[in-house]
Amino acid sequence: ATGERSLIPTFVLAMRWTGDNKYVAKALSDLTETEIKTWHEAYEWQELNPQIIPHESYRALKMRFLGNTDRNFLDFFKDPYGKRERMKIRLEEISWGGVLVDVGIPSLDNPPMIDAKDADYLVDDDLVFGVEINGDVRAYPLRIMGWHEMFNDTIGGVPVALAYCTLCGAGILFETEVEGRDAPFVFATSGLLYRSNKLMFDRETRSLWNQFTGEPVVGPLADSGIKLKIHPNTITSWANWKAKHPRSKVLSIDTGFIRNYASGFIYREYFASPDLMFPAVVGDESQIKRKEYVFGIQQAGAAKAWPVEAFRDRRVINDTVGGVDVVLIGDAATRTVRAYEREAGEVFNDDNDGELETTGESWAVTEAFLVSRDQKHKRVRVPGHVSYWFAWNNYHGVKSELYSE
């Protein structure tokens, strides 16, 4: 019956909190007419069936579960913002990520930086998020950011936050100053997830934000229309970044927190596994597997992703996304991809000496531009980022095109 099916989200919640209880699973299987044995299966069925509206008692029950874990969770769902009609995502698809609000995964706020020459804790193969804004060059090692997943900082005079979702493999650099707001947003980790993607929150309004899109989805700002500007950042090895930017600043290992910041320690098993830690519907994997890395660009209402492995045997790809011609320069070994606009008909090639070339012209690769050797022409950097394929293809609301050779 329709009324009984409204209880499905309640049983999905019970599957999580009872540890896949077989009696709850049997009830769910009967209601959904689908064999369900685990919370992962139940959650994925729920994601695929948005027509199921939860029973009126669902919200109170979910708040009880969350509140018993950490009463700070309740701040995100206060009336009237926690009502179904005020939220941009379904309450039943919001799940606990296993940590408390802003405690288990604390953000780094204006963290101490040191000179590259003094960063003796890093080894050449360590990956970093490299950032350059207005000549201010910084590196934030993934081995540290994996523990914190968020920094709030000012780079080149621009207030920014890097939100790193380890579960979906994406580190995205957002500008946090928004027109009409008195002060830049300061972000932290909520401890909640949506389809295996972190929900961050801003400390001022305590609205929940989609980490992948930079948009508020629950809370006072959900109807604001705010969408944070994305700045380019580059994943690369410390050796490559240091060679390209010897005067770079780098995040100090003295963060003020006690963590095991050793190379390759954080999330080692998850990064090596083909499986997801938390449930999310995964689409067709005939071309690319769920946890293969892609570099994605979204613009002009279109989205496109390039497998990072496509750069294993080539450095340069000329392509188009959303009607805009782009050139991508990558290195699969270090998960590095940079993208730049190019003019119509312009084709870039690798000169095998670290630069690019077009007909009769050489170009230097910088963090902000491609610059012609005579300094007369520039091609602007296009914001994009690396993530797992399952995440890129699941969070935009736009079906992504996938590059194939």
Spans of features found by a protein language model:
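Mid-to-C-terminal functional-domain signal that highlights helix-capping/loop sites
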Residues: V12-A14, Y23, E33, K37-E405
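Alpha-helix capping and inter-helical loop/turn segments
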Residues: T2-L7, G19, D30-T38
